[in-house]
Amino acid sequence: MKTFLPSKFIVDRIEDRCIKCKVCITQCSFDTHYYDEDDDQIKVRNQNCVGCHRCVTFCPTNALVVRNNPLEYRQNANWTPEMIEDIFKQAETGGVLLTGMGMDKAKPIYWDKLLINASQVTNPSIDPLREPMELTTYLGRRPDKAAFDNCGNVEENITPLVKIDVPVMFSAMSYGAISLNVHRSLAQAAKNMGTMWNTGEGGLHSSLMEFKDNTIVQVASGRYGVQNDYLNSGRIVEIKIGQGAKPGIGGHLPGEKVSADVSLTRMIPMGTDAISPAPQHDIYSIEDLSQLIYALKEATHYRVPISVKIAAVHNVSAIASGIVRAGADIVTIDGMRGATGAAPKVIRDNVGIPIELALAAVDSRLREEGIRNQASLVISGGIRNSGDVFKAIALGADAVNIGTAALVALGCHLCQQCHTGKCAWGICTSDLALTKRINPEIGAKRLTNLLRGWSLEIKDMLGGLGVNAIESLRGNRLHLRGVGLSAEELKILGVRAAGE
């Protein structure tokens, strides 16, 4: 069937710079560039270009330019080019449109409408270069009170808290969705910075057991790789109920990405689609969730906190309250801008709510019910920089997870082709010819640098507030002001308008 789809991008080659080295051909995993022997020229298939910029980055003579196709549709506010092209695709395939990464629509980004306070005159600021600043964060359940014996020993069992040196962790991204070299980069960077990385729902590769003190292992609806050794190889065990990019449906790893090594780790046949059920089939109520939480606590000998991850949806505050009362030590909330390796486009773009509103609502609800101390709040889904981290903690988060930002640090250009298994940067692929493009040592260094830079910036902002510890910022919304927000939005966020 002839396609009606135009090329998304046009690749221009500056001929007097091109030395015909064929680097562009070897670097492009989408067969955009090819060599024509008859004409002795390197030519381009524009329809294959996904805009990943791999060829541009590695061209030794800067001979390539990738630009948007200037093809213009007749202007129509209702029928945008994206709407038209989506219909073309479904008319040609008859299937669900899949995409990767997070929602890219122009929905409100509340981080950009929140501004941070600073000390002036009456409350002196602190110079982080000359005075100690504390970013250490503890995750887990804190008791209402502790009983001590005559020797000063605690009389009751308390779930151990997990200490992280920076309030930033790496989001759940499964082996298969991303390559083993990316997993190793994340794990090593987490160890370097004294924080945590998350295996995602695809199990833990045997070569990464050395990082178990910095590992969060996940139990999702597919239960891939879940067995006793796996559960006891993590510092935190996370039950995944949902994720921000696709609330209400299960994970989907195309068979093209299920290599021999991935199949061994996930405990599924090679080359088969790994389709997780939408629900966890042993969880249909808060009571069922509580049973699984305590089953995992028993399996791990009450040695580690149990986290429950949910998507930011309507009534999220009531759901989070139930999760805390069910016994969870950590609640992780993933917002609608959270990314994924593969999701139906219609769900990614239309389901869920912004993480800023969900976080503020959940923190307020738990405080009102007097149970905020019983669980830590971790949020994810759209954290782009240290300013977002700072504002999230002021809104009530104990820590944040980053996924897309971490992948960008490794070279991701957000071409949204994660689901194809052809990632030219070697990130979201199981193709051994592509995965070797990620050097784990260099990747770990880049991620370590990212977190170290953010840590320094957070300390600068804390110092500007006159605060020397991240705990003094947590949930302190008086340090935030809103700009361009409605009265209802300000009320939900719990912040005042700028100027008040």
Swiss-Prot record:
PANTHER family: ARCHAEAL-TYPE GLUTAMATE SYNTHASE [NADPH]. GO terms for molecular function: 4 iron, 4 sulfur cluster binding; glutamate synthase (NADPH) activity; metal ion binding. InterPro entries: 4Fe4S_Fe-S-bd (IPR017896), 4Fe4S_Fe_S_CS (IPR017900), Aldolase_TIM (IPR013785), GltB (IPR024188), GltB_archl_type (IPR043578), Glu_synthdom (IPR002932). [4Fe-4S] cluster 2 binds at residues 28, 49, 52, 55. Its cofactor is FMN. CDD domains: GltS_FMN. This is Archaeal-type glutamate synthase [NADPH]. PROSITE patterns: 4FE4S_FER_1, 4FE4S_FER_2.
